[in-house]
């Protein structure tokens, strides 16, 4: 018994040592190289002091030409879906009250599995038919008593008419909703506004050097004649800037926080479109319920288990008894701890993926948090179960990070660099979520970041094709948020861009956008039912 106990202790010690080395390399390769007197190469954010428009290095690791062309291609696709619309007066914009929604081929009872189509005719506040499309609508069917819901597909014919299609997933009384989130004139104004500047958010950087603490202005773009610190990701040519404090080195940047700036690129008349009373207005009449029955007694065909690389249907699934049921595949019941056994899971992104970390820790009681000696809400998190060889880490993505709370930037870096440092193998799982913090900035910033992550994943899957990669799209958020900065329209365009960029990779996609629409959630941090459904799909992808 003593020999057995000794062996177990030895194996646990060996695992701790291996895990510590792996985690140190993952988190701070420079520290490890220094410890073992290896040559140091700063492969993360390079610090450069220079003028407000620093020269681009001549010898780039990768030519940016291909990236620029791809950014333009994705932008052009979005531009075609969001053409400029004239705005002269509120009366001539789309009115949910005056628009009509007509069920095509109505029946007393509809059948489970059928498609229900609704024709929407957009009209302005004077009752006139609209001659063009572009309205931002959100369609949903739901049965509160059954805790069931699903999104609807909206097809824009670009002539003022729309086809809203619902798949009738369940039987019972089903309510229908078609919300006019923003009229086409408002959508056009938001799209134009988003392209106009990086200054809607003010960043304040805190430099700590000895006993000295200095705050200066920071930004993704700084138009300043004073000396700047440039924090450059040299490989992907993404940079963040701060005004350099006198007699303080750029490397002393330690903390960051942000706040909204009182700036708008909308006219006073356009801003009236985004008053709360004009957002998410119902188009359907009050008598919007239909009856659905199970007309066919045949057994439903067995769907294959959800796996990586599957093309998602539209809608991607539905909610039933507060749990998610995918449309094109099936979810097997999986014991979480058994599935996580022996796996290294890296959660990278914003606080919506940090919710996963919190969920794992609350549901797997043998996970122990490791003190990484950081402070603040956005500190990196690590939880391990040494007996089961489980390691789960959450790490925030690189700039921009928006928040009034102070957060540390000592270890901040872009996700692409973390991926490049990851060896990968069949028990390594990477989960990425980007979106919410990019909404207030021109969308080319988000597209560039997504493309750089895509390239890093290509490199990872080339050297280690067994590595499991999962993307969680962003979700809907509060309707009363600052619309010009955080509207769900901005999130939806990013959602479309992300799906376009990653469609060629063999990765698992968790369609958090469609899920939160189906649940009827308007919260940047969805409740536990939604998080549980997301993680249930994730477990089916990896086990």
UniProtKB/Swiss-Prot annotation:
Q: Does the keyword Signal apply?
A: yes
> Glycans attached where?
91, 159, 223
Cellular-component GO terms for this entry: extracellular region
Q: Which InterPro entries match?
A: Ig-like_fold, Ig_E-set, NXPE4_C, NXPH/NXPE
Gene3D superfamilies listed in its UniProt record: Immunoglobulins
Location in the cell = Secreted
Keywords in alphabetical order, please.
Answer: Glycoprotein, Secreted, Signal
Q: Where the protein is mainly located, per its record?
A: secreted
User: Is Repeat among this UniProt entry's keywords?
Assistant: no
Q: Which residues form the signal peptide?
A: 1-26
Looking up PANTHER family in the UniProt record yields: NXPE FAMILY MEMBER (PTHR16165), NXPE FAMILY MEMBER 4 (PTHR16165:SF27)
**What family does the database annotate?**
Belongs to the NXPE family.
Q: What protein is this chain from?
A: NXPE family member 4
Q: Which gene encodes it?
A: Nxpe4
């Amino acid at each position: 018994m003593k020999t057995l106990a000794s062996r177990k202790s030895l194996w646990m010690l060996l695992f701790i040592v291996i895990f510590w080395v792996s985690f140190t390399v993952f988190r701070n390769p420079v520290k490890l190289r220094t410890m073992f007197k290896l040559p140091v190469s700063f492969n993360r954010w390079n610090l450069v002091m220079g003028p407000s428009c620093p020269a681009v290095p001549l010898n780039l690791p990768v030519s940016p030409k291909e990236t620029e062309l791809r950014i333009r291609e994705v932008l052009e696709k979005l531009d075609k879906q969001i053409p400029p619309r004239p705005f002269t007066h509120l009366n001539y914009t789309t009115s949910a009250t005056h628009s009509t929604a007509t069920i095509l081929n109505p029946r007393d009872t509809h059948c489970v599995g059928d498609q229900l189509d609704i024709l929407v005719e957009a009209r302005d506040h004077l009752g006139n038919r609209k001659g063009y499309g572009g309205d931002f609508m959100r369609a949903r069917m739901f049965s509160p008593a059954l805790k069931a819901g699903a999104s609807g597909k909206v097809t824009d014919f670009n002539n003022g008419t729309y086809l809203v299609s619902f798949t009738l997933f369940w039987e019972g009384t089903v309510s229908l909703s078609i919300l006019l989130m923003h009229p086409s004139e408002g959508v056009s104004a938001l799209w134009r506004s988003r392209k106009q500047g990086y200054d809607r958010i003010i960043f304040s950087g805190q430099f700590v050097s000895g006993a000295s603490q200095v705050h200066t202005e920071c930004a993704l773009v700084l138009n300043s004649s004073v000396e700047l610190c440039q924090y450059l990701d040299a490989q992907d040519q993404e940079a963040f800037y701060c005004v350099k404090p006198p007699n303080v080195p750029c490397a002393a940047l330690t903390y960051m926080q942000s706040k909204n700036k009182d700036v708008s690129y909308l006219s006073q008349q356009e801003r009236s479109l985004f008053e709360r009373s004009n957002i998410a207005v119902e188009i359907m009449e009050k008598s919007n319920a239909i009856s659905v029955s199970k007309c066919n007694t045949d057994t439903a065909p067995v769907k294959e288990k959800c796996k990586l690389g599957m093309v998602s249907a539209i809608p991607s699934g539905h909610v039933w008894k507060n749990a998610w049921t995918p449309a094109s595949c099936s979810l097997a019941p999986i014991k979480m701890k058994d599935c996580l056994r022996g796996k290294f899971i890296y959660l990278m992104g914003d606080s919506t993926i940090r919710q996963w970390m919190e969920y794992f820790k609350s549901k797997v009681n043998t996970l122990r948090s490791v003190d990484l000696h950081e402070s603040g809400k956005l500190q990196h998190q690590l939880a391990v179960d040494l007996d089961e060889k489980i390691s789960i880490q959450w790490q925030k993505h690189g700039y921009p990070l928006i928040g009034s709370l102070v957060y540390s930037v000592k270890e901040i870096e872009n996700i692409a660099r973390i991926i490049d440092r990851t060896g990968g193998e069949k028990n390594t799982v990477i989960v990425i979520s980007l979106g919410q913090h990019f909404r207030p900035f021109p969308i080319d910033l988000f597209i560039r970041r997504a493309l750089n992550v895509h390239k890093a994943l290509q490199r990872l899957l080339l050297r280690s094709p067994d590595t499991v990669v999962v993307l969680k799209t962003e979700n809907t958020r509060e309707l009363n948020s600052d619309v010009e900065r955080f509207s769900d329209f901005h999130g939806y365009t990013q959602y479309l861009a992300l799906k376009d960029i990653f469609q060629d990779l063999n990765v698992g996609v968790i369609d958090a956008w469609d899920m939160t629409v189906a649940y009827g959630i308007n919260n940047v941090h969805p409740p536990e039912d939604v998080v549980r459904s997301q993680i249930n799909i994730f477990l089916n992808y990896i086990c």
